[in-house]
């Protein structure tokens, strides 16, 4: 994800995905190692844009996405 702060870190985002493959919920996982709100928001925004394969059935799926922010 794009970000404009001179910091590095790992942001782990919990996601809930509906059967259509759309992310319908996000939250920051405790395994995140940065308190920087800009990095956290960038990761959550990117997770909300993610799309997954559709699945049969009415149940939502849960999981995590890990984003690594590195300075270059």
Where are these regions (language model features)?
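Short, low-complexity, Pro/Ser/Thr/Gly-rich segments in the mature regions of secreted, periplasmic
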Residues: 64-71
